[in-house]
């Protein structure tokens, strides 16, 4: 029998009108019950879900009454990706583990990528799951030992 954790309670979305060069950003209070129960810290990656839509965002936290309890403010990139209205309910939680990072770690240690590993990396990049650090690791891994013909077929 596998135990399923209950999803975190929903928060009300507030449009922040923050333009962050296409970077999805979420702003939450440091005393937010979701931050505490989920163990979310500043500069964490979070997954924001609104119905069938989701976006991975960078979390910043504030010690201010700028946001009410139970609210999360979103940048324009996050707002557009979710296609929501002011006050709509969203769920904020940890993003899923990136299995494709195992391929990058193997590549850093001199092993070649399989077609499946490269496809998983590309899929995660296209879906916006890679942070700048993840992208830098991929570029470093492929620059130190360039991709060979078999890896790019």
Residue ranges and their predicted role:
Residues 96-153:
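Acidic, glycine/proline-rich low-complexity segments that act as flexible tails and inter-domain linkers
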């Amino acid at each position: 029998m596998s135990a399923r954790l209950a999803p975190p309670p929903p928060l009300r979305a507030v449009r922040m009108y923050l333009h962050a060069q296409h970077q999805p950003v979420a702003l939450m209070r440091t005393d937010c019950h979701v931050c505490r129960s989920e163990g979310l810290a500043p500069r964490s990656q979070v997954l924001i879900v609104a119905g069938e839509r989701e976006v991975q965002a960078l979390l910043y936290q504030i010690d201010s009454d700028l946001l009410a309890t139970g609210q999360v403010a979103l940048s324009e990139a996050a707002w557009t990706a979710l296609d929501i209205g002011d006050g709509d309910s969203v769920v904020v939680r940890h993003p899923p583990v990136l299995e494709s990072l195992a391929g990058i770690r193997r590549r850093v240690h001199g092993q070649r990528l399989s077609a499946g590993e490269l496809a998983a990396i590309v899929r995660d990049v296209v879906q916006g799951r890679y942070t700048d650090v993840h992208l830098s690791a991929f570029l470093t891994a492929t620059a130190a030992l360039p991709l060979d013909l078999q890896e790019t077929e």
